[in-house]
Regions:
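Active-site residues of response regulator receiver
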Residues: 54, 84
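Short amphipathic alpha-helix used as the core "switch/output" element in two-component signaling
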Residues: 63-76
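Charged docking surfaces used in two-component/phosphorelay signaling
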Residues: 16-24
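C-terminal output helix
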Residues: 108-117
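Acidic, metal-coordinating helix/loop segments flanking the phosphotransfer/catalytic sites
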Residues: 31-50
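Short acidic/polar segment at the start of the alpha1 helix of CheY-like receiver
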Residues: 11-15
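The feature encodes the CheY-like receiver
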Residues: 58, 88, 107
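Alpha4 helix (beta4-alpha4-beta5 surface) of REC/receiver domains from two-component response regulators
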Residues: 64, 87-104, 115
């Protein structure tokens, strides 16, 4: 299944890496550099199916976007995967409690990401 994926990451090289990989897998990639860009990307039609979200976006916390998305009924279908260098139990617990559906630590395991995307049932891209 192919998906529309919003990538929110302030590291331009990592954003481009994810974009290239997603497109090579047949997915559509939408890129956002800042938290503000992420808010625009998540609310713009056509809506994404999945958000790959860096947690530390400069001085801002990506979990702010997660909290907002989870309060929006029309975005209930959107899956959010944190992509982060954070890997302590406390960090992972706060990521899960915020409403992320899963978490990938950097550097990302592309096999695990492929399996995750394949497991999702609501594709937008045909």
């Amino acid at each position: 299944m192919k998906h529309r994926v919003l990538v929110v990451d302030d590291d331009s090289q990592y954003r481009e890496l994810l974009k290239c990989w997603l497109e090579s897998e047949g997915h559509e990639a939408i890129l956002a550099e800042t938290l503000e860009d992420g808010f625009v990307g998540i609310a713009t039609e056509p809506l994404p199916d999945v958000v790959l979200l860096d947690i530390h976006l400069g001085q801002k916390n990506g979990l702010t976007l997660v909290h907002w998305v989870r309060k929006q009924r029309h975005l209930a279908h959107v899956q959010i995967a944190a992509v982060t260098g954070l890997n302590t139990f406390k960090d992972l617990k706060s990521i899960g409690e915020a409403g992320c559906d899963t978490c990938f630590t950097k550097p990302i395991d592309f096999k695990a990401l492929r399996e995750y995307l394949a497991s999702l049932s609501v594709p937008s891209v045909s």
